[in-house]
């Protein structure tokens, strides 16, 4: 699966070249190469291409980059490897192929990490997302002592059993790029692969935003407004699920509003994360908010199974 790219776009020289190489690798395998979901999410798993498409019996192979926001992880741009906004590369393969680990190692080789030359270890680490009601059997992948990615066999999503089981690969792009480029500070990553006056670094692109969003997340986000937004998103999700529910006299009991409803679930999750970063949610309240988001996700997952994409026969 070798595809020639310009020298300056080699993963060892370019952050965007790393992404392009993974796109080419998984496209050659047969994945649909999707675009990032256009909403604030905490991880690539929240993309409906994973959360919803992991459910039901239909085959689904997809790969995409997903900008991810974790407000509490912001460090005002002062930490060399901790960010409140970062990028994940997500691969979802359903049904799970028997050679998932082999495929993953092949993708590492494609970006210049030869498993024969590096200490590649798989450390058991079962994955769970409380807000999505999801969990799976999983392993962290460590390369020369540093975690670079994780792969998971989904058992449940939205509180619903996955049948068939889907395989998920999640690459931490910044961390992987730091390893491949040999730099210790994420902001020093070469973004475009050029040198001299034409060179653009990760810091050139993102440092100012990281500083400003850290201030926003920890100091300035309006908590009263966010509390209202959470209530609104929760109510709208439920209203859309009710509006799209099949009527009792429908010949085919198909749900008609799953994706708009799931968008509201995503919004509620991000607002919760902002409230958590602002420190206005107690330990007891935190569990309550997580349960409320999980209930929305579960309802969206159940509705998805009543659609053609979810396996309902037309």
UniProtKB/Swiss-Prot annotation:
One of its GO terms (biological process) is glycyl-tRNA aminoacylation. InterPro entries: aa-tRNA-synth_II/BPL/LPL (IPR045864), Gly-tRNA-synth_heterodimer (IPR006194), Gly-tRNA_ligase_asu (IPR002310). It holds the Pfam family tRNA-synt_2e. Its EC number is 6.1.1.14. GO terms for cellular component: cytosol. It catalyses: tRNA(Gly) + glycine + ATP = glycyl-tRNA(Gly) + AMP + diphosphate. Disulfide bonds: none annotated. It is found in: Cytoplasm. Belongs to the class-II aminoacyl-tRNA synthetase family. Tetramer of two alpha and two beta subunits. This is Glycine--tRNA ligase alpha subunit. The lineage of its organism: Bacteria, Pseudomonadati, Pseudomonadota, Alphaproteobacteria, Hyphomicrobiales. The gene is glyQ.
